[in-house]
Amino acid sequence: MEKLIQSTISLFISLSLKISTKSYKSIISILFIISLLSIILTTTITVYHDPERIITTTTTTTSASKSVFTASSPKQQDKLQQEIDQHQSDNSHEQQGKRIIIFPNNFPLIKNDQLVKYYIDTMNQALQPHDLIYRNCFEYKIPQLSYSSQKIDVFSDGGGGDQSGIKCRKLSSQVNVKVSPAINKNGNMRQILTRFMQDDGLYFQEFLPFFPNLKEQLQSADDDIINKHWYQFIGSTVWLQQYGVHLMISRIIYTEVDQGLPIISLAYLQLFDRNWNELNDVELIIPDYETTTTTTTQSKYKYKSIIYPYFAPIPIYHNVKQLNTGKFFGVEDPRIMLITNEFGFEEPIIIYNSHHRKISNIDYENGGDNQGKINFKNYRSLFIGWLWKTQIGKFNLEQLPSEHTLDNHKANKNDANNNDYSKNEYIKIKELTRPNNQRNLLEKNWSLFLNHQEKLNHGYHSFIYFIYQFKDLKILKCPLSSSTTKKNNDGDDRFDSGCQWEYQINDDDNFGSGYLHGGTELINVNELLDNYLSKSSTSTSINGKQLTNSIKDRLPLNRQIWIGFARAAMRHCGCSETMYRPNMVILVKDDVPTNTNIASGKSNYRLTHVSSFMDLGIEVLPWWEDKGLCEGKNVVIPNGISSWTIENESNNLESESSTITSNNLVDYLTITITRRDTTIDLVYIKGLLNALLLNPDNNNSNNDVDDTEEGSSIFKSSVLFNVDLVKDYSSTTTTTTTKNVNKNLDCALQYSHKYCQIYGEKLKIEDEFNNKGKDKGKDKSN
């Protein structure tokens, strides 16, 4: 730009010698405009960098630097946050189209203007005036919220032995936590759909036949028309540490009736800043794993960009001519989770279920004209998707015949799916099946978790694990590598035999989820403790690290613990046709090593604790807005655990002579929930890990709970530190054993049913009281 200005000035000076004096004013005006443009171009494209961390420009990164994260000072973070807030405010008003471009914290370039140069020259992208570009410097933040005390009834399995004669109350204990009000995060549906239609991409065109009246709906000024047909719910989020943002996936459905009868269900991706403000037109610069080359010492990789928000282009089987069957097409129950991939980067994956089909047979006898008739069998199966990887076409979703096969066989004449999507780009996916590619007609409600020890051993996650069913515990182990899912249809998956059984109490073919279904993922407590210990010294305290290390030392060798939230479905239990609430579950695993190698040993699992229904003090919304809470469904569904961190918290303790500051450890868990299948809500739970593990002898002292209060911590006896806690039930599959391992689950469901009954009776009494009050008011008015 400077060279351009200098050359332009020289040109005008030389020309000025040949022109009259009257033209000088015009020349000066032109020069002023050029100078002004140069100032705008060099100042409105803002680059933020930390001058203390300047790295040589290179596109080669070794694995050692991939996990490094360094935040800027709080003052610098606040300053940049103000810029982002102003940027988003301008973008929503007079200056639409402004982008925020975020490079990861571990990006190898940081020197002033290097990000701009890399973006323009290496990535061949264009920057516009007022674009904001920076390398992330934000760290995770806990918001300031009000909390109320809540109690959770938890049932243990009694520590083994014959529990068939023991009453549930003997196995129950109470956990005390603090819970925030629900914070709604639903988007503006009119804006979401308007952007979807205006972008007019291939994915929009593919699904437009399912909602042909969208344009007319958006042209109407009545938002009730939009709200009647479109719903957003089932939100699941993760914190992207390298980018300083929350990434959320949710369902957006279209219906002609209500939220209970969708026609099509799509997945929507959006970003929020660390204060949970939604971000629009944000471009993340992510590693392009599919162009990565690996040598013996290092990996060379390029970067690509993804702009949020947008509808996730997930390949889906659909047929608009089959809508009268009562089923819907598309993505159901999406869950998002971060994994560490083989390149050492954190990468978001999703788990969801979706309708699809497989060829059941080819009928040559009734095909006619020497052609066979292709018959399909319909399934609703579980899939994994890699949000930052892509594939071309739907070759691994549908068993569609190839072109030469179609010449010899007849497809269904009503098959609208013969449209050619073979060149469309989608998110990379893969179906998850039981061993030997076995599948039920309906596969859903799997509860996912990751193995922290596996990551420590290999440096990345090789597998993802699922509780396939809680009753008669069954656990699947599925490979995470996407290598078997080709980008193009240039191979097959004949050697991919699906997931394998990691653990089964009963080695049989009796599959059934029972009343307890999958809800959130399960979080590894061992990793939670390690994450606290790995924090910088400014984020931890000496006594905090000592306490955390002492807990790790007390845990038996080779033990891992997971905590999550399932959901029970109680039908006709006293309120509504179906009631859903969260149920906390605790899963424990012990690795039993062989004489030579623990890796070749056996893994024993145990569902040690299950809670009854948890309402967490959350306001319940009626299924139909103009009717009562016990009509239709009564729904509070846990969707995902957004984050779980251990923080230092200072308490001032008054003594006779002075005030003493005491540093305590307090954990904050963020869970996403859905109410009435129409909301996305955040709820913060404070002190759950404290109650369960960190302070087993103090009965939640950090949660301001009176130690004399009835009910004590289930871990006051340090049950999770018991070496013999996990036993090998899979080797003894008697009826008595089965009753033992399911006893806590049965008790939790029994008390959940009681919760529903009491809830219904309470509402009846309240309704009667309110109706009497209304009648008295009418009498007085008369």
From Swiss-Prot:
Subcellular location: Membrane
Keywords, alphabetical: Cell wall biogenesis/degradation, Glycoprotein, Glycosyltransferase, Membrane, Signal-anchor, Transferase, Transmembrane, Transmembrane helix
Residues the record marks as carrying a glycan: 445, 648, 699
Upregulating conditions: Expression is regulated by SEF1, SFU1, and HAP43.
Enzyme Commission code(s) on record: 2.4.1.-
Region spans: Disordered: 66-96
Compositional bias (Basic and acidic residues): 76-96
Protein's name in the database: Beta-mannosyltransferase 9
Gene: BMT9
